[in-house]
Amino acid sequence: MFKLVKSSLCAFCLLFMLAATAFAAPAQVEPSVQQQYPDIQVPVVTVPGNPDATAAINIEIEKNIAAFISQTDECYKDNEDWNKVYMGNSYTVTCNDDSLLSIVLTKYINVEHAAHPMRYIHGLNFNPQTGEKIVAFDLKEFSAEKYGKDIYTPELLTNKLAKKAAENDGLIIFDGILPLSSLPEQFYFDADRHVHFLFQLYEIAPYVCGVIDVDMDTESDDYLMYR
């Protein structure tokens, strides 16, 4: 009898360990394409063993893509070249571990006869264990756990931008932008769990600067990218 109970307990423990491993496994991300918009690539996420988190994450992604399509439609519906407006989206998974999933969406709009195409780079960040979306407010907790203080602040981001602008390496910031009073809405995590803030075209700088990507965690001088 004792051997039977011991054997059953061992089997239960093994199943529990396998289930826990599956639950903690990185999410799977596969591309899907909108039938009406073949150039819009949509990431479809599966969190193994966690259908609730899977559903919550995919709902957020679908809402984001749907908003992009509807806002573009609304913006250009009265344009005489509306039938020559091209929309697209691609994505990159920048962080995928047991507690962080970060997906960067690169959206573009090209209108015939326009001066130039528009591009938007947005970060979608999730806790894959719960499916909850991670927003800028949550970064205080991440910073406190990692550094014991908040490094994701408008003041520190202002310092990084001001330093690069002073180096005359190509960053031209519009007058009146600095100091920042708030953080940009868009950010993502890279594979090292560094937080990158994103400034969109024309948000703080001319079009020629592109989308500005600032790594808040790196100690390297190469903390700013033009995308």
Residue ranges: model-predicted function:
Residues F2-A24:
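Sec-dependent N-terminal signal peptides of Gram-positive bacterial secreted proteins and lipoproteins
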Residues A22-R227:
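Compositionally biased intrinsically disordered regions enriched in Thr/Gly
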